[in-house]
């Protein structure tokens, strides 16, 4: 049976983690019901992350998702095929962030010039309050073709030709990125040599092919602050950033590291609002004390956390 949908409140935001099931309309009926009960709606969804068991799951899922958003642009999205889902009977493992109705936030698409596949129907960038959500970016040109090849070249293209212009159009900047998630199906060392190192970043080594543009080897999504929030953004030990109570943490190896970061931010691990455990076959699994999921990837163990510091 699919796991029940648990929505965790963090100030003006709701987090759903590890929403699993078939790639069907029923999945979104469950999500919509949970959002309504929690004081939100599909129209307030700010971001979606989808992990699939295989590529055959993508078309039915995207069709169901498009229908669920009822003609509106789908929230910024990242889709990755992983080696194995936590629930082997499921076709998709979904993560969602939404604003509460009480926040007054109305998601607004930002005209960044970024493209996306027509079948996916998602908005490449949304502004919700003073947060900017940029969908997963590949090294594609305006025609949708891959414009760079190899991990280092793709990374540089994504940063210089996709992220920097998009953030500028959204009245943000690279140094206002709160968190980046990076999926690499090649050599992660090449990525690190081409990536701006001062940003909280989670690097996940995935199988190849892993992306809907199958020859691509790097996909990057980011959450950034609008420039009006710069004065409220706080760096935490160079490994996390804090804005208005939301704690954005870069990828970690252990929960001991996480405890130190949360303590430095003025909170503790009881305020984890999302934990993603990426692990090689036979390695770490999800921690039951957190809203979490576990996803099998190519190698290693990477812990990706989001937290809350009560104001």
Q: Where do the protein language model's features map onto the residues?
A:
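N-terminal presequence-like segments and the immediate start of the first folded domain
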Residues: 1-311
């Amino acid at each position: 049976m699919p796991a029940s949908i648990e929505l965790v409140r963090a100030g003006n935001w709701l987090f759903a983690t590890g929403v699993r099931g078939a790639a069907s309309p029923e999945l979104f009926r469950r999500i919509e019901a949970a959002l309504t009960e929690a004081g939100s709606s599909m129209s307030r969804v700010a971001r979606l992350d989808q992990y699939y068991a295989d590529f055959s799951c993508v078309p039915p899922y995207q069709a169901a998702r498009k229908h669920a958003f009822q003609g509106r642009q789908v929230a910024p999205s990242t889709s990755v095929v992983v080696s194995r889902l936590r629930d082997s009977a499921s076709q998709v493992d979904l993560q969602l962030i939404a604003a509460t109705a009480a926040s007054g936030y109305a998601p607004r698409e930002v005209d960044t010039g970024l493209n996306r596949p027509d079948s996916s129907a998602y908005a490449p960038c949304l502004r919700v309050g003073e947060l900017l959500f940029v969908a997963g970016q590949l090294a594609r040109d305006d025609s949708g073709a891959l414009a760079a090849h190899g991990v280092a070249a793709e990374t540089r293209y994504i940063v210089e030709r996709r992220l920097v212009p998009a953030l500028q159009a959204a009245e943000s900047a690279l140094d206002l990125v709160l968190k980046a998630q990076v999926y690499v199906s090649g050599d992660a060392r090449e990525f690190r040599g081409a990536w701006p190192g001062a940003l909280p970043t989670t690097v996940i080594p995935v199988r190849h092919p892993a992306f809907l543009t199958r020859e691509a080897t790097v996909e990057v999504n980011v959450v950034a602050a609008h420039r009006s929030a710069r004065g409220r953004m706080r760096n935490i030990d160079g490994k996390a950033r804090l804005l208005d109570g939301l704690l954005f943490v870069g990828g970690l190896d252990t929960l001991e590291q996480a405890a130190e970061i949360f303590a430095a931010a003025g909170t503790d691990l009881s305020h984890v609002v999302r934990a993603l455990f990426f692990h090689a076959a036979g390695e770490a699994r999800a921690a039951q004390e957190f809203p979490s999921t576990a996803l099998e990837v190519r190698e290693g163990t990477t812990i990706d956390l989001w937290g809350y510091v009560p104001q």
